[in-house]
Every structure is written in structure tokens, then in C-alpha cells.
């Protein structure tokens, strides 16, 4: 075998550059440690020491958008009154419209955190849409530090646009994500949400 052939063998890749190696089950502890350390390095770099954490639904939208979804569902159902899927779509849209005021509540709460605490606290969320977006938006609007700890889900969840540069993080392990949510926290605020929000709430309570 030539030297060139040897240099192209998979075993010759440096371990820390070998993605195939890092994805093996046996390397899970290393991956978990990386998920602990990467955000930690960035948070220290930005001098983040204390946080206020906001939990809440990813599905709740601003009232204007929520009303638009109800209207669209009503119009679709009017064309096919017997369609069960469209009936359920309208039911869901109406339910989310009732929760829409919490979007503004989360945004204003984060406004107040930054207005009164300045640089002392950063606002932290799960980094996704809905009420997480609202809280990040509130901090962002007041030029505060706005952090998002997102998670890989079966359905893709994009980060919201109101997270401070270099403070959006994507996790694979829920446990490590929760660790970072708790580590620097001084207070938690829980807005309406689903199973994910309840899971986070009871994790904190216990």
C-alpha cells in the first residue's frame, strides 16, 4: 500500500475531525460533554452570569396573526362544511387565538426585565417560535441579551430572529439543554404551553 493510500484511510483522520467516529454510540459521553462546554464558552465570552428564563408554547402567535389563521380556517370550512380536518383546524385556531394575549404579555415582561435590570440579567428561552419568540423579542427590543437554547425535534424547529448574535444554541440532548436553562437562572416565568412546557416546569419544581 502506498503512503498516499494510507493517508486517505479513515483510520488516519484525526480523532477530533472524525464526524463518523463522534457519532458512534460509544462516543455519547464525549458528545454530551461537548454540549455542556460549547454554550459555556460562548456564555462566558459574553459575560452572562445571571438569567431570567421564560417557558411557553411554541404555537401561540401575535393576536393579528392568530386572527388571520381563524379567518382562513373559517373560509376553508365554509367551502367544505363537512370536512372533519377543517373543523379541527378551526377549533385549534380558535383555541390559539384565546391564548394570543400571552404573546404580548411575554414580550412586555422581557421589556421590563431589561428596562429595570439592564445588563445584569439575560433573558433565556427555548429559542423557538411562539411565546419563546415573544420573550426573546422583548429583550431584543430593549437591547438586552437574548439567549435561545433550541433542541433537535422530529419536526424541525427554527430559531427565532430575536436572539442575540452568537447566543443561539442547538442541542441534541434534552438533559444538557435543561442543565443550561437552570445553571445561571435567578427566576423562571412559565406561560401557557403544552407537554414541553409542563416537562420544564416540573423539572424545576422537583
Where are these regions (language model features)?
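Glycine/threonine-rich flexible loop motifs
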Residues: 65, 198-205
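A generic short-segment signal for beta-strand/edge and adjacent turn/coil regions
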Residues: 18-25, 117, 157-160, 186-193
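Amphipathic alpha-helical interface surfaces
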Residues: 105, 177, 197-200
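Glycine-rich beta-alpha loop segments
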Residues: 6-15, 19-149
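Predominant activation on well-ordered alpha-helical scaffold segments within soluble catalytic domains
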Residues: 107-111, 182, 205
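C-terminal amphipathic helix plus adjacent low-complexity
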Residues: 1-4
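Phosphate/pyrophosphate-binding betaalpha-module
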Residues: 124-125, 129-191, 202
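Residue-level signal for short, function-critical loop segments
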Residues: 58, 193-194
Amino acid at each position: 500500500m502506498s503512503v498516499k493510500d494510507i493517508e486517505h484511510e479513515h483510520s488516519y483522520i484525526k480523532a477530533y475531525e472524525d464526524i463518523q467516529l463522534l457519532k458512534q454510540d460509544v462516543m455519547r459521553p464525549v458528545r454530551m460533554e461537548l454540549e455542556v462546554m460549547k454554550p459555556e464558552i460562548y456564555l462566558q465570552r459574553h459575560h452572562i452570569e445571571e438569567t431570567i428564563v421564560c417557558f411557553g408554547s411554541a404555537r401561540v402567535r401575535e393576536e393579528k396573526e392568530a386572527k388571520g389563521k381563524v379567518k382562513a380556517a373559517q373560509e376553508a370550512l365554509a367551502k367544505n362544511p363537512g370536512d372533519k380536518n377543517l373543523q379541527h383546524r378551526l377549533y385549534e385556531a380558535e383555541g390559539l387565538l384565546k391564548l394570543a394575549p400571552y404573546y404580548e404579555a411575554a414580550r412586555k415582561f422581557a421589556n421590563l426585565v431589561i428596562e429595570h435590570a439592564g445588563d445584569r440579567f439575560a433573558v433565556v428561552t427555548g429559542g423557538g417560535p411562539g411565546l419563546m419568540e415573544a420573550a426573546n423579542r422583548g429583550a431584543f427590543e430593549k437591547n438586552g441579551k437574548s439567549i435561545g437554547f433550541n433542541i433537535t425535534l422530529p419536526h424541525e424547529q427554527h430559531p427565532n430572529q430575536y436572539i442575540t448574535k452568537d447566543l443561539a444554541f442547538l442541542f441534541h440532548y434534552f438533559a444538557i439543554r435543561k442543565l443550561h436553562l437552570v445553571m445561571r437562572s435567578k427566576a423562571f416565568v412559565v406561560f401557557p404551553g403544552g407537554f414541553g412546557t409542563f416537562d420544564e416546569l416540573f423539572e424545576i419544581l422537583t
